């Protein structure tokens, strides 16, 4: 897979395409999921709705993940509180 800048990874995710950053720390998959390291931070539904978990303060994971979330929020149709996200089927690996 071709490597992309983080800004392009989230843009391609929102467009429904798989993509990976040059460090492999931010990536989107063909199932519509968006990952920061091993943490699922977003899901694009089959209808094309982009949902992002707001893993920023006070639900901070890492500085890098906060940067990834910040970029993804620019393309999000919905931003979820991480407590809601974690109980949602969208947060599960391989879902949707």
Region annotations inferred by a language model:
Residues 1-96:
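Terminal leader/tail segments of proteins
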């Amino acid at each position: 897979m071709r490597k992309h800048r983080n800004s392009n990874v989230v843009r391609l995710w929102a467009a429904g395409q798989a993509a990976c950053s040059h460090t492999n720390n931010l990536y989107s998959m063909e199932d519509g999921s968006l990952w920061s390291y091993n943490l699922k931070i977003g899901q694009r539904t089959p209808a094309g709705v982009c949902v992002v978990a707001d893993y920023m303060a006070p639900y901070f994971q890492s500085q890098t993940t906060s940067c990834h979330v910040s970029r993804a929020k620019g393309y999000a149709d919905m931003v979820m509180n991480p407590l809601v996200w974690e109980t949602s089927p969208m947060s599960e690996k391989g879902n949707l």
